[in-house]
Amino acid sequence: MLRDRNEGMSTIPGFSQIQFEGFCRFLDQGLTEELHKFPKIEDTDQEIEFQLFVETYQLAEPLIKEKDAIYESLTYSSELYVPAGLIWKNGRDMQEQTVFIGNIPLMNSLGTSIVNGIYRIVINQILQSPGIYYRSELDHNGISVYTGTIISDWGGRSELEIDRKARIWARVSRKQKISILVLSSAMGSNLREILDNVCYPEIFLSFLNDKDRKKIGSKENAILEFYQQFACVGGDPVFSESLCKELQKKFFQQRCELGRIGRRNMNQRLNLNIPQNNTFLLPRDVLAAADHLIGMKFGMGTLDDMNHLKNKRIRSVADLLQDQFGLALVRLENAIRGTISGAIKHKLIPTPQNLVTSTPLTTTFESFFGLHPLSQVLDRTNPLTQIVHGRKSSYLGPGGVTGRTASFRIRDIHPSHYGRICPIDTSEGINVGLIGSLAIHAKIGFWGSIETPFYEISEKSKEAQIVYLPPSRDEYSMVAAGNSLALNRGIQEEQVVPARYRQEFLTIAWEKIHLRSIFPFQYFSIGASLIPFIEHNDANRALMSSNMQRQAVPLFRSEKCIVGTGLERQVALDSGVSAIAEHEGKILYTDTDKIVLSANGDTISIPLVMYQRSNKNTCMHQKPQVQRNKCIKKGQILADGAATVGGELALGKNVLVAYMPWEGYNSEDAVLISERMVYEDIFTSFHIRKYEIQTHVTSQGPERITNEIPHLEAHLLRNLDRNGIVRLGSWIETGDILVGKLTPQTAKESSYAPEDRLLRAILGVQVSTAKETCLKLPIGGRGRVIDVRWIQKKGGSSYNPETIRVYISQKREIKVGDKVAGRHGNKGIISKILARQDMPYLQDGTPIDMVFNPLGVPSRMNVGQIFECSLGLAGDLLDRHYRIAPFDERYEQEASRKLVFPELYEASKQTSNPWVFEPEYPGKSRIFDGRTGDPFEQPVIIGKSYILKLIHQVDDKIHGRSSGHYALVTQQPLRGRAKQGGQRVGEMEVWALEGFGVAHISQEMLTYKSDHIRARQEVLGTTIIGGTIPNPEDAPESFRLLVRELRSLALELNHFLISDKNFQINRKEA
């Protein structure tokens, strides 16, 4: 962000800035802080001392490039070197060497890390800030009970309670509580100090009897009493050093370490002036907290809102990496201690390099990036997805809440979220409200709070100044909602404006305003800020749109939206998918692979990304946008990336849509489309799949890659080269061999052919046998081979196998079953692809491209799609693009309608087409049935909407099962496409079958095709030879399972078969 106190703000901050700032803070401060905590290590006899000289540590440049790290499944990291010294105390000699501590994964230009060849990103966690919080609850008698909760930096909680007799207790566990006097004495205070440091000494003395005086008579007695209550120990424990250490480890360290943020919060809440470097809970803190609790009892002071953002802190990538680095150093310390004692025991002479191993640091970071819940695989479906993923905030994770235990209050929108956390963009399902997205201007401050910018309005100066404020600062200020004129501060404001004050939204005179917002969508996330006319949509549909834009597939030919919000350029810029000129110069050469330019007398070659696979199998590709011998400026777009056009985000296509029913093919959110979408590659996308195979060294010998595979038909091997690997550029069909591999195995004597046995008997020749373990193309994987990688790791053992990866590109046109969506939560499945001559057509003969159901608009309340549709038609006819800020109704009533209708009227005049804007029903038009040529009865809304093709495609979801695996317990088919599972016939499906009276089909579904073991085998046999399917005589396995489960509850259940002959009842045993 360009920020100046005089000039204001000219650009929005970089969307990846939070990740960059966090990682830089870890390198600048976190590394040094943790290294300074590393202690001097001595042996048991105190003859040798090891220490690190942390002031001159070095981080080396990475040995490999990012691209190579991805292809070879390596970690893009930097080596950490620290000078270390080994001091011999007897001779006072010191040996100093620079030791290699380990590898630290680095952050690339996208704000992500590459670990084992995979893009990983660390998302921000929202935790309860350490400090003290007061709240009030009603007991069973309806009386208010006040409690104060002290939260430590580790997340441990201790509660202070005040009962009816004004006695104060500290709850040390769920069942046990002790007097506040005992706790203060155990922490080192005597009775005189306690009474001198409290505001209500008479209350403390009122509940102090002789027994309590004895307990707090000395520190030892207080510690013993505290230990007895805390550990629930009976008898008379004896004071000892080990008892103090146990208390220190189990209670004080977990519940009394406040950290720098907790110390600051405690000082502010309790009006203390304890030094900032004193990060542990002191007796003064406890006594001041008790004073405030007594004040609450007498109606003084204010209660705390636990869900206010001022009471939350952000655990950013810097904090998480610093914690892991500290953990790695603790492990390194233990390893060095063990190595020193082992060297002295065996009378060896150690050196600093021999003592230090890089394993603790490297394995700690790899396990963190691979296993930690807040370290996630970067979603790279499209450029927007990459940007949004790094700006997520989560209440989940270690120290946080869980999806099942989180209350509604935590999930709900809070007034303090204004400008900090988007009120719209969150996940759907069990994690709703727990995973959010930061607003576009939000940043993380030094104290872990989310800050947002405001214009500060002062009476002395007419110029408004930009200030970043945490949630605690703007709570008691009157904040005017930013309007569209916020960047133009010279314009006179209205006399009365809507404002926010103390978590309430009021209407206040302009003279009383202290702060004002700076941007119309300052309080929205990136995804929500890309929705035009969002103010006309229901928030639930805007939420769906924010999520679905992240699921859009980059198309073969991208297209800019006609109606946008203006943020499309910055999203594309910050995503890093476009190639940007870093210097001004002249283009010397350009092709699909690279761009060569001359700048400042130097020749610079810029490689372009070609057909790179994302982890969602979408195609990332860069296309040059500059021509040879042209001069360029710094910051100019050299090449567009996936889903960008001219440096702007382009996720979908502008297509001609109509809102009308059509023969029921668009009922229930189905969508009818024209065959033009297929034949002209309007919604065609490329997808790249990766197939890999490894070679191991088995006990029978090494596996071989070869093209000589016995017992396989020649046409399956037609695409292999002489090495046994598929050729580049080959067209591959299902079942073809991609990599030929043979695995050696030992065969039994009976399995040899007669000629092999003869050779063994006469000549003693050992005939080797091998099993074919080739890599074959699975079902649905046809396409073109675009890349083959043979990665040979050092060693060649079974622990370092060779890996062969084959990348296959698929061209996917849109088809029935694919999912499409607009930017207003209007989603649907393609139900039918109609010939263009049968589609409804306009009065100028243009056929409609897509037909949506009009009933999907009023009940969903996403009317923004209608405004976009009409304005898009005007923009298409006038060859204009519109960038509209949200909430334009603040200018005047019906501002959106007054924007759209004049544009439609102008388009009607310029194109001489009066049907574009008809005053009787503006925005609608008479259209004709393509099959009969007759006009439809009612005028229809037609226009150009921006439609996205989502990653939920029928090719990835369609699945059929003839036979497969069964669950061991229920004997029913497994669940899921990946397991070749069956289709579930649930309760509602059985009702539907019953409704049509199809008894035999229902019986087949529930018995033969499911869990009737004997019957399903007989069905298979009769189906092959042709015959009648026999009736089953026993119960299916699920019924037998139910009977056994009831028997375990001592309930006997039998079933009987009633024969129609002689009406005999035969009891059957389950």
From Swiss-Prot:
It catalyses: RNA(n) + a ribonucleoside 5'-triphosphate = RNA(n+1) + diphosphate. InterPro entries: DNA-dir_RNA_pol_bsu_ext_1_sf (IPR042107), DNA-dir_RNA_pol_su2 (IPR015712), DNA-dir_RNAP_su2_dom (IPR007120), DNA-dir_RNAP_su2_hyb_sf (IPR037033), RNA_pol_bsu_bac (IPR010243), RNA_pol_bsu_CS (IPR007121), RNA_pol_bsu_protrusion (IPR007644), RNA_pol_Rpb2_2 (IPR007642). One of its GO terms (biological process) is DNA-templated transcription. GO terms for cellular component: chloroplast; DNA-directed RNA polymerase complex; mitochondrion. The keyword Plastid applies. It holds the Pfam family RNA_pol_Rpb2_6. One of its GO terms (molecular function) is DNA binding. It is found in: Plastid, Chloroplast. Belongs to the RNA polymerase beta chain family. DNA-dependent RNA polymerase catalyzes the transcription of DNA into RNA using the four ribonucleoside triphosphates as substrates. PANTHER family: DNA-DIRECTED RNA POLYMERASE I SUBUNIT 2. In plastids the minimal PEP RNA polymerase catalytic core is composed of four subunits: alpha, beta, beta', and beta''. When a (nuclear-encoded) sigma factor is associated with the core the holoenzyme is formed, which can initiate transcription. This is DNA-directed RNA polymerase subunit beta. It comes from Ceratophyllum demersum.
